[in-house]
Amino acid sequence: MTAVLLLPKTAVKANPGIPLAVFAGLAVLVPILSQRGQVVALSLAALATVILHLRDRRALWPALRDSRFLRVAVAYVAWCLLSATWALDRQMALVQAGQLLGALLAFTLVLPVVTELTSRERRLVGMGCVGGILIGVLTLAIDGYGGMPLQSLLRHGDPHPPVHMLNKALVTISLMVWPAALHLWQLGRRACAALLLCIVVAVVVPQESSTATLALSVGIVAALLARLTGRFALWAIGLSVVAGALATPYLVEPVRQWFTVHMDLSSWWSAHHRLYIWSFVLERMSERPWLGWGLEASRAMPDFGWAIWPGQDRMIPLHPHNEFLQVWLELGPFGLALILIALIVPLRVAMSYSWGQRMFVAGAWAATTAAMVPGYGAGQTWWLFTVMGLALLYRAVLIPEEDDA
């Protein structure tokens, strides 16, 4: 019976690194072509990777069983499903919980596969990462500085496509540059790794996305801190994010009042709008402080007693633009604790890496958490798949080394 369930072994050795390399090569281009294409791309890559892994009769369950992330993921999905019983919109909550379950299932199946890739397979994925960044740089430069001809074509000849159409790709390249730079670093091409980061900075910073600029800047600072202080940097950035998430309810209103007095609304419209949303979220959090309002409640949150921001049709447009506050609002402090634990796991694992690998872990991790604060919603599938793709590519590229610090 067991033999029937095994995929046939052929003379040609399966290479599970190929689907990941293809995904890496398209990771920045896909968000430019399709707003939700990242979900399809990573799903297909994950499925093909697992099939090729099993085709070569490599073990899957032992590594999956020992996954630290799996335990936290199961607890988080279970809490999301439970929260649907008191959610404002149960159907929407169950749909979102199902999407989250599928995404995390794909991630936890592929994660043990990428940890067992051979050095040759890892180099192949690394080449895909570098190629993907170069393709992304070229495409973003053409669209960003050339009048957006590609976006105009995709929008059926629209002569003036909105600039924000590139924002998702800009954020994606700000994250995906880290595994690409790590690959070059591990090959001994450290100058090339630094040059690649500089090229991405030159493309991202002058463009429209403040979230991408913030993520890239914070990531570079964290990487430099890790270079100078070693493991201390991992502890420092991890504790700072936990402390910042827990202190947010006490900081939002003073910061909003300071912004109102000192920062011009026309120049800082986006920041004023986010702070206004966060103040509203904190008021609603205080009404259900322990269990939260239920998964996906942000989309249906009652806005009585508050004036709608000019140009908006509701207080929270899709999400609160702060993932920590969104999780706290919807899932309460227990949900927030699970998210923070899930974020700390990769930093804890990275303590055993070499100093160079720790440096790039710090950069990728800090860039991701920085983008979580002003950027996207916890329930946006494209963002969830982008973060999971980053984690998988980083782990696939990383070549185990002896700790040297």
Can you say where each PLM-predicted feature lies in the sequence?
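A membrane-periplasm/extracellular boundary helix in multi-pass inner-membrane enzymes
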Residues: 138-141, 224-267, 282-287, 295
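Aromatic-anchored transmembrane helix interface
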Residues: 69-76, 90-113, 124-128, 133, ...
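Transmembrane signal-anchor hairpin modules in multi-pass inner-membrane enzymes, especially those
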Residues: 1-92, 115-123, 127, 183-190, ...
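Transmembrane alpha-helices of multi-pass inner-membrane enzymes
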Residues: 45-50, 342, 361-373, 377-405
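Hydrophobic transmembrane alpha-helices and their immediate junctions
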Residues: 330-368
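Alpha-helical transmembrane segments of multi-pass inner-membrane proteins
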Residues: 121-154, 161-227, 345
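Membrane-interface alpha helices of multi-pass inner-membrane proteins
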Residues: 25-31, 77, 194-208, 220, ...
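Long extracytoplasmic/lumenal interhelical loops at the membrane interface
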Residues: 265-279, 287, 291-331
